[in-house]
Amino acid sequence: MIKKIISVFLLLACIITLAFTAFFYHSKLSDQTKSISSLSSQQAQERLQSYQDSLDFYKKLNTSLSVAIANSLRDKAVEELNAIALRIQENHGFIGVTFASLDGTMFTDIGTLDWNAKTLRRDWFVKTVELGTKHYTAFDIDKTTGQHVLTIATPVYVGNDIVGSVALDIAGDQIASPNGSGMFMMTDRNFNVFASDLTHSTLIGKDLTKEKPLFKNLVSGQYVTFSDADSHWFAVSQTEIDGENKLFTIIDIQQIVQTYKRDIQLIIAGFSGFSCVMLIGLYWVLSKELSGVRQIREWILALSDGQIKERRPIKFHNELDTIAQSLENLQFRLLDVVRNSHRTMNDLSIKQTDITYSIEGNTNNSQQELGLIEQVATATTQLSCTSFDVMQQAQSAELNAETAQKLIAESHDIIDSSSKQTEMVTLSIHESQQIINQLREFSDNISSVTDVINNISDQTNLLALNAAIEAARAGEQGRGFAVVADEVRSLAVKTQQSTIDIQGIILKLQEQSQLADQVMTRNVSLIHETQVANRALIASFNLISDKVLEISNINSIVSTAANEQKIVTEDVAKQMEDIRYLVQENLSAMERTKQANQNISDLTTNLNDALSFFKIELTS
């Protein structure tokens, strides 16, 4: 028990220590972040101020030069201007010093150049000379020296007139001096380094993102920490310059990191020591307060072995006294329970014997009832089957009657349809007979026409003969006419022969028309007889349909009665089955009751055996 309490206390102490350490860690981390941000911001501001001061100085210097050389530039004093440019370049270490006249001539520290700023439209020349404004460019890489160069240009006035321009080419590391405290790097918009402190001077002219990939994703106003090969910690931040250039400020945070680690270690050590002291004190208190647990444990073990005996009261002067008193009360209660249980078990054994006899009598009666119910159920089932057979036969007869009635109705429809078709055939035959009569009349008309044609051909033949005779009389002059007359007579003969053929055909046509008329008349008579037979057949089918309908109605009544009888017998059979089920359930319940009673007897015996476990020892 003491081990468990100490383990729980130790666990709680660890949790509290971890929680406080996490809180302190977060607090210190926040302080560290603020310190680093403050130092980075301060150093960046100092470096920006130094950069701006240098820029302002060179702007003022440029303005002073524009005043000093105004007259010389107006007069184009070549040697004097070149000498001044060289002296300024040597004194200040500029990349180049250029004086441009109004026509674009350029006087530099290396002499007068052979190209013209006005002709080439140099940006600094255009803005200072033509627009009259001061101008300084962004840092660009000089093609000659490879250095980043910033050009500052100022217009030169004589009175109110512009006579030229002064341009100073200043190296990047000259504006951003490597001297001073703190590490830094300045880059152009493409991350090319043009100025840095002495420590990082080797990076000048190189791409910072390739040399220091960590710096690429820096956001202005934030910082990133990193360590070198010697595990020395630094923090770097980025600041925008002039909207194009970037300033990377690096500060040494090794002391801040070491202070942070030391504070965390002190907190952990302090809480660990405090937890150990508390653990020792807790063990001493628990050992003293729980000294009586051993005696109570022995008492409980004796009760668990069934030993119930009187004990003298034990006093521990703490909460264990309540436990000891409760154990003493429990012992007295157990004694009463054991004695009462023995008496109850004896009475229960007697009652269970009586229950067993009653259950056996009820079981025998229920079995007899079950046999009688099964006989009634069997008879009811047979009656239900008979009713079902009658109902099926009646339904089958009714279905056959319905089928016959449908067939009769279909036959009736067919006969009606046949009668209608017969009437249509009769009408068609009448129409055909009329057409044949007309055809016979037309053939008679044609016969009269052929008679006319025959007469014409006879006359034509006669005329042709007369013409031939007259042509013969005419001699040689009538020979041509004789040929024509022969041809006409030949045509008349052919016409006469065709007329005879047509008359033969017309005669045959008239004979066939008369024969067709006779056949049509005979068909009309036969169709009339068929219609009479169809009407008689329809009357017979109607009579059969009525009889079949009566049979169907009788079958329907028989089927309904058989179905109702079947439903009643099935209901009786179902009721008998329910009664049989209930009787079986009663038998099962009695069997279960009997088994439960036997189980109770066994449990009573077991309980007596269990109660014998308690050994009662009473002092006199």
Swiss-Prot record:
Location of the protein in the cell: Cell inner membrane
Protein keywords: Cell inner membrane, Cell membrane, Membrane, Methylation, Transducer
SUPFAM superfamilies for this protein: Methyl-accepting chemotaxis protein (MCP) signaling domain (SSF58104), Sensory domain-like (SSF103190)
Topology of the protein relative to the lipid bilayer: Peripheral membrane protein
Residue ranges of domain Methyl-accepting transducer in the record: 344-580
A GO cellular-component term linked to this record: plasma membrane
UniProt xrefs under PROSITE patterns: CHEMOTAXIS_TRANSDUC_2
Broad class of the protein's primary localization: membrane
Pfam families xref list: MCPsignal
GO BP: chemotaxis; signal transduction
Highest rank taxon of the organism: Bacteria
Entry-linked InterPro entries: MCPsignal_dom (IPR004089), Sensor-like_sf (IPR029151)
Family named by the database record: Belongs to the methyl-accepting chemotaxis (MCP) protein family.
Its biological purpose: May function as an environmental regulator of TCP biogenesis. Negatively regulates the synthesis of the major pilin subunit of TCP (TcpA).
Protein name (Swiss-Prot/TrEMBL): Toxin coregulated pilus biosynthesis protein I
Species of the source: Vibrio cholerae serotype O1 (strain ATCC 39315 / El Tor Inaba N16961)
The organism's taxonomic lineage, starting at the top: Bacteria, Pseudomonadati, Pseudomonadota, Gammaproteobacteria, Vibrionales
